[in-house]
């Protein structure tokens, strides 16, 4: 499978400045060598307004596209600013206007690449669409969700899976009675509410409360669910009506262990909230199965 490369920009001087590393400007040479060796890559770009966006972003994508087919795709995610920024460069975050401008820019480039390369090549994470209050791409336009782990098309994929899977369920589970809750970050909150509605429409006796959790640990501008900590879950859910089970995304925990980013374990979270907590994969079928079992 392709290796993931954090690109951010292919402008050598700008990359040295952004990464604060005097060797960071040699990225394109390295990627060319990898391509010549037949190694396949996916590129990630964390976009920072006023630094590597607009013209710089176009330059970066053109450089990366020149390495097709070895560079499969480029994922673009908006910068998130934590509250730990003493002595660091001043950064802005995307707002509705700047996110919308970025969507327009990428749509134009996608059309061009589709014509020239047979692929849209550059994909924005769902966060851009949420910030800009604009619709996501259609399911097929994500071309197999090459950068799903970077949050590119995650909402479209999960939403489609939930709707399609619910149509196929016709068994004893439909009579199940239970009350449960879901905890999620700000960016996925609206989607999770819609998903809960879909499930409750099909399962008349299941009640789901969705709770939006603010990221006080890293800072409020960090809105993705995967960066929420157990501390924030405990602080914001401790006196809430959670029903019999709380569901969270598995991505809140470290890859191979049930520990949150603040080093609290899943078991400790369950003890503090006095409730069973079930992590779900970012897959529609897994979420529905776990909630309705």
Predicted regions and their residues:
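Conserved glycine-rich "GG(E/T)P / GGGxP" loop and the immediately following alpha-helix
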Residues: 8-28, 48-56
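Conserved C-terminal portion of the radical SAM core fold
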Residues: 30-87, 97-127
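Short acidic, glycine/serine/threonine-rich loops at helix termini
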Residues: 15-19, 55-57, 85-90, 134-137
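A general structural motif
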Residues: 2, 38-40, 71, 119, ...
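Conserved, mostly hydrophobic/aromatic
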Residues: 5, 74, 246
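Charged helix-capping and loop-helix junction motifs
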Residues: 23-25, 58-59, 261-265
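Radical SAM enzyme core and accessory elements
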Residues: 133-293
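Short secondary-structure subsegments characteristic of cysteine-rich extracellular domains
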Residues: 87-104, 112, 260-276
